[in-house]
Amino acid sequence: MPQPNRPRKGSMGFSPRKRAESEVPRFNSWPADDGEVGLQGFAGYKAGMTHVVLVDDKANAPTEGMETTVPVTVVETPPMRAAAVRLYEDTPYGKKPLTEVWADDTHESLDRTLSVPDEGGDTDELIEALDTEEIADIRVITHTVPGDTAGVPKKNPDVMETRVGGGTLADRLEFAADLIEDGGVHAFGDVFRAGEFTDAAGITKGKGTQGPVKRWGVQKRKGKHARQGWRRRIGNLGPWNPSRVRSTVPQQGQTGYHQRTELNKRLIDINDGDEPTPDGGFPNYGEVDGPYTLVKGSVPGPEQRLVRFRPAVRPNESPRLDPEVRYVSTASNQG
């Protein structure tokens, strides 16, 4: 008889499994600097899911050129605004902020979240005074605009940092300066194109405190062990020595409301209007009537949750731009 063996239940790569610090997800890495100069991120609000019928454009696939049904997530993506430019420098302890310049005219809702300077800076003087050799990275402080999404009743904007990529360092600095001087308004279509692959980050649906069976996926007790009064507890907390409980032991605790980033999510369509809204609206969201994006598959988080996108850092296939969508289902999700 072979020696019985199996991997442990649950991944330690996600520990400690605690609540996310903020409902705005963060990106710790960005794509390489190739292509045109532009922002490398955008954000929207998850409305719900539906399905579309599109023509399979994958080469050599058994269904190439045929109509296929694909599940999609509808993300409402109204225009965002850029409020400031922040420059970073390299230090022995990582990248640290070097300086920042705020726009002269910021949105009134931003005062509810941040202490915005009374007067903005002069970007031209900043470019002339700074030595580009000191600059390690250029990022833009962007935020959503409350009221642009009727399904998300928020008064405070969601603020985040978005990297400027592509071109040379001087080109990126000029792009960021021009962006905030022109009002900072930018759309999802200015950053992405239908058919591209992106990484979607969000805060998952919170489930509160759960036991080890649901939290870690351990097996329930069987047979005689199940007749000891409980079935959903682990057998023991570890050996006598070392006389402590190790962090690898599956125990009950917080489940859900974690930040998760899903790689290589294909953008099926970038459009404007109420076409994807089902009969009766999306449950817990309502109607989508404005700029929206259809993402293949699911994205982390419940309805109304903020979802951030960036260009794929590890694409597993070449992008197939502008897929042909022939039908978007608007059947009611309420039965």
UniProtKB/Swiss-Prot annotation:
Keywords linked to the UniProt accession: Ribonucleoprotein, Ribosomal protein, RNA-binding, rRNA-binding
One annotated GO molecular function: structural constituent of ribosome
PROSITE patterns from the UniProt entry: RIBOSOMAL_L3
Region Disordered, annotated ranges: 1-35, 234-256, 312-335
Family listed: Belongs to the universal ribosomal protein uL3 family.
Entry function: One of the primary rRNA binding proteins, it binds directly near the 3'-end of the 23S rRNA, where it nucleates assembly of the 50S subunit.
Protein name as catalogued: Large ribosomal subunit protein uL3
Natural source organism: Halobacterium salinarum (strain ATCC 700922 / JCM 11081 / NRC-1)
Lineage: Archaea, Methanobacteriati, Methanobacteriota, Stenosarchaea group, Halobacteria
Gene that this sequence comes from: rpl3
